[in-house]
């Protein structure tokens, strides 16, 4: 029997003495064998794509068309529906076949990637430099690594432009702001004004500003993807064709572990940005598929009770709550008419079911009394009872105890999982960045294990 303390333990034909890393260090054992590292890279991509395809088909098999997606614990089908596949007016699923096709295509792709990963891990050359010079690299070849970065940027840019093409020419995307309840439509006139697109980056993240999370137009979303796609492709060609400047060479650490830390930091940043986006934004993440946001559920409850009590004869304009403030309507810090009660904290909420009832100074009292449509009432009642909040009493004025059993709003799951994973990626970034910098400076000593008692233990057998 081999034990954890046996340095000669061989996994995948590599041991601690030949690689400098123990078996549990994973791909660190492949740091100097580019061919095998490519195999691990491709196999990892295959696993990701396999999960995507398998989970996609799992969700299709369990999907019930009569129920909203957000009631069924789905996280992949809402993304496909947002892209305009299989859905129509009001987010109604018309055909699940596009979902099925997407899952099968991912499974086929994962098989190709899996074969490539196994081939390069077991049968391919140890290093690419000898057999495939174009694909070969070493960690110190700065020009080559800059070109690899450029290739990655080009592919990311093409992905962003592909979304723009789908929205403009490939059948359109789902727009929750379409009058009367949302629909799939082609974005024929995306906004390309740089002051509008990049203005989101300098907006405050607080209150009614909301940084990039406040985007509420598909024209802005697609226009932003066009800008990002062009910038990424342009930057990719720049890095492919140019050499790193001297100040770049001096600033960055050039080693495999340093590149790993940069990548982990980038993924962590994207994960942290995704958290408020999926939690607050109902344009990119339509509530028809992902369920209401927290503020949306709270505002929906206030709206539902306002409509109910108004029909019972209440004067919604003058009724006061127990604090003396307006029970149904009140003034916001900026002077707008907003919903009263505990939902006042969400006064800056914007949603497609509520915006038709606004006027030049917030909610329009005349519209609330005379123009409320049945679809708005139904949607508000539905969102009120599906808040992304788990509580035994109430949060933000939303009574959630009725839904606390056997219901998790997809926004809760997606926001929490992205935050937790982004945090771990960020910790990994700090860890590997510290190790890479220490190694570059030359004072990385590691832990002194010469006196560890484990070194004196005999194998168990």
From Swiss-Prot:
Keywords: Acetylation, Chlorophyll, Chloroplast, Chromophore, Manganese, Membrane, Metal-binding, Phosphoprotein, Photosynthesis, Photosystem II, Plastid, Thylakoid, Transmembrane, Transmembrane helix. InterPro entries: PS_antenna-like (IPR000932), PS_II_antenna-like_sf (IPR036001), PSII_PsbC (IPR005869), PSII_PsbC_sf (IPR044900). It is found in: Plastid, Chloroplast thylakoid membrane. It is a multi-pass membrane protein. GO terms for molecular function: chlorophyll binding; electron transporter, transferring electrons within the cyclic electron transport pathway of photosynthesis activity; metal ion binding. [CaMn4O5] cluster binds at residue 355. GO terms for cellular component: chloroplast thylakoid membrane; photosystem II. The keyword Metal-binding applies. GO terms for biological process: photosynthetic electron transport in photosystem II. It comes from Euglena gracilis. This is Photosystem II CP43 reaction center protein. The modification N-acetylthreonine is found at residue 3. Residues 1-2 form a propeptide.
